[in-house]
Amino acid sequence: YRGGYTGPIPRPPPIGRPPLRLVVCACYRLSVSDARNCCIKFGSCCHLVK
């Protein structure tokens, strides 16, 4: 992972509770293409975005 983490070892988010910025990245005011990019990069998809 790059950026955001200050600890020596970045820990993956718990299942069902990704970090807030990923939720925002995937779900909040994004176009479909941006949401897809977030899905590909972070594995965080917002299925409400069509």
Swiss-Prot record:
Q: Name one GO cellular component term.
A: cytoplasm
Its family remark reads: Belongs to the penaeidin family.
Q: Which organism is it from?
A: Penaeus vannamei
Which Pfam families does the entry link to?
Penaeidin
Q: Name one GO biological process term.
A: killing of cells of another organism
The protein's job, in short, is:
Antibacterial activity against M.luteus and E.coli bacteria. Antifungal activity against N.crassa and F.oxysporum. Presents chitin-binding activity.
Cystines in this chain: 25-38, 27-45, 39-46
What's the main place this protein lives? cytoplasm
Annotated keywords: Antibiotic, Antimicrobial, Chitin-binding, Disulfide bond, Fungicide
- Residue ranges that the Swiss-Prot or TrEMBL entry lists as coiled coil: none
Q: Where in the cell is it found?
A: Cytoplasmic granule
Q: In which tissues is it expressed?
A: Higher expression in hemocytes and to a lesser extent in heart, testis, gills, intestine, lymphoid organ and hepatopancreas. Traces in eyes and subcuticular epithelium. Not present in the brain.
The GO molecular function terms of this record are: chitin binding
Provide the protein name.
Penaeidin-1
